[in-house]
């Protein structure tokens, strides 16, 4: 039975390439993005296009339920969705700063919460959170972006420790 992978932010760039690579390796791949029209090329080669907005809990919940219904399992989660918004901390509206965290941190965290129970039940699984060198270094005019990526690094490290007893 092929392994099943979910890749968020798969409409372009790294997410698209990760989806293509996993598909070539024989995985059943669900490529997720807000706009599935941007996933049409992936669908033509057999990758499942999945509409998912990582700022919308219902969207994420229904996406995971669809994968489980269709395949019975989820083996790999690649949390790749994210973006950078730049400017002086004092100039970025708080709504924009919150949105940066919704996309880069809270969506990633919610997907982990949704898939981890399935992975624990099947006693296997891999979660990869795509971060950035911006999670290790900070530059002026990137405070909100860097803060979100530092949060991804911290969550990933905590998740590694929390799941250590379940790894083989």
Question: Model-derived features: where do they sit?
Answer:
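A glycine-rich helix->loop->beta "capping" turn
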Residues: 66-79, 85
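A hydrophobic alpha-helix adjacent to the NAD(P)-binding/active-site core of NAD(P)-dependent oxidoreductases
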Residues: 49, 92, 100-101
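Active-site helix of classical SDR
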Residues: 112, 148
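The beta1-alpha1 cofactor-binding region of Rossmann-like NAD(H)/NADP(H)-dependent oxidoreductases
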Residues: 52-62, 94-95
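Substrate-binding pocket helix/loop in short-chain dehydrogenase/reductase
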Residues: 88-89, 96-98
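Residue(s) in the substrate-gating loop at a strand-loop-helix junction
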Residues: 132
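Conserved glycine-rich cofactor-binding loop
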Residues: 11-12
């Amino acid at each position: 039975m092929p392994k099943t992978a979910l890749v968020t932010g798969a409409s372009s760039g790294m997410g698209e390439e990760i989806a293509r690579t996993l598909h070539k390796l024989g995985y059943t791949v669900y490529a997720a993005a807000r706009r599935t029209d941007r996933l049409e090329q992936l669908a033509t080669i057999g990758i499942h296009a999945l509409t998912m907005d990582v700022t919308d809990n219902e969207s994420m919940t229904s996406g995971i339920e669809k994968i489980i219904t269709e395949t019975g399992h989820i083996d790999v989660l690649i949390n790749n969705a994210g973006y950078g918004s730049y400017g002086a901390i004092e100039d970025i509206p708080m709504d924009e700063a919150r949105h940066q965290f919704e996309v880069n941190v809270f969506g990633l965290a919610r997907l982990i919460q949704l898939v981890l129970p399935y992975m624990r039940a099947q006693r296997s699984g891999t979660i990869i959170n795509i971060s950035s060198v911006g999670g290790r270094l900070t530059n002026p005019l990137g405070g909100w972006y860097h803060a979100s990526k530092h949060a991804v690094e911290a969550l990933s490290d905590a998740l590694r420790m929390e799941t250590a007893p379940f790894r083989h």
